[in-house]
């Protein structure tokens, strides 16, 4: 019998995770079954526990359950601790271990696939929701010259910044929260959209001179030409969606579960050509 894995979310029908993990399994000769698991909005824990009780080996967790997954697991590793969000669960004996592979996925896509450098650069992170919690710490570990978190409601951005800078002085080094209408006058080398604004279409008020020469505009949403990417393209900026991040965070999950690192490039290329 194949080892069972699944992605759990609501909605989950659109998820590309089963395709990605099937490709990884073929590539590495692993015998796994990977399904979609729709959890009722009020029954994530029950759904996940049943899956593991019935012999499931691991889960990927997507919107809107990453925070609940953090509450569910018995212990957290690495990025999941700081993010207070879990997107990968591994069953070890009767313990559930939680991980967050979003930050590693973003960095792998930016650095390996896109050849971007973050160290010493000026970075803008748009949004202060769960997606930002998952990637802020890994971005900061690359030591950018400046990292600004922008959000419609400033106090949410300030809360995010404080969450990751609980040092004695209480003064974050090189990271600050700003409202969108206070971003002018300093172009950024990397702008990451971690809001769902890409989906709804409404875009925050961004200044014309947002992008430095050679900048990269990165939208975590994939498969859609978002308003943000259209804005960046109109400014002549190099643009990319979140498909690479999706595949890279999946590869990190696969490594956690199976101990093997799949080759992501052919899988990204396959998904791009399918779209």
Listing of model-derived features with the role each one plays in the protein:
Residues 9, 98-103, 110, 114, ...:
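Glycine-rich adenosine-cofactor-binding loop
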Residues 168-188:
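Short acidic low-complexity segments
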Residues 142-167:
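NAD(P)-binding Rossmann-fold cofactor-contacting core
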Residues 216-264, 270:
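Rossmann-fold NAD(P)-binding glycine/threonine-rich loop
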Residues 153, 182-204:
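Rossmann-like NAD(P)-binding element
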Residues 2-114, 224:
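Phosphate/diphosphate ligand-binding glycine-rich loop within oxidoreductases
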Residues 63-64, 193-198, 221-222:
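Short glycine-/small-residue-rich Rossmann-like dinucleotide-binding loops
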Residues 68, 199-217:
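Rossmann-fold NAD(P) dinucleotide-binding segment
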């Amino acid at each position: 019998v194949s080892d069972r894995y699944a992605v759990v979310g609501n909605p989950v029908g659109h998820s590309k995770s089963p395709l990605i993990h099937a490709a990884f399994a073929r590539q590495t000769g692993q015998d796994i079954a990977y399904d979609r698991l729709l959890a009722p909005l009020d029954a994530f824990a029950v759904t996940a526990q049943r899956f593991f009780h019935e012999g499931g080996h691991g889960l990927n967790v997507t919107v809107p359950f990453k925070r609940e997954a953090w509450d569910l697991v018995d212990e957290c590793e690495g990025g999941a601790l700081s993010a207070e969000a879990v997107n990968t669960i591994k069953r070890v004996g009767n313990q559930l271990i939680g991980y967050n592979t979003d930050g590693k996925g973003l960095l792998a896509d930016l650095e390996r696939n896109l050849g971007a450098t973050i160290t010493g650069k000026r970075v803008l992170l748009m949004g202060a929701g769960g997606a930002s919690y998952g990637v802020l710490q890994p971005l900061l570990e690359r030591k950018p010259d400046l990292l600004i978190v922008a959000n419609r409601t400033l106090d949410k951005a300030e809360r995010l910044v404080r969450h990751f800078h609980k040092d004695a002085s209480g003064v974050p080094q090189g990271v600050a929260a700003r409202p969108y209408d206070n971003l002018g006058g300093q172009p950024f080398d990397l702008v990451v959209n971690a809001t769902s604004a890409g989906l709804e279409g409404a875009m925050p008020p961004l200044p014309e001179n947002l992008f430095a020469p050679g900048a990269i505009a990165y939208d975590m949403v994939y498969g859609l030409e978002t308003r943000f990417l259209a804005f960046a393209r109109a400014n002549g900026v190099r643009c990319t969606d979140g498909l690479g991040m999706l595949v890279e965070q999946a590869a990190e999950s696969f490594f956690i579960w199976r101990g093997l690192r799949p080759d992501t490039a052919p899988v990204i290329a396959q998904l791009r050509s399918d779209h």
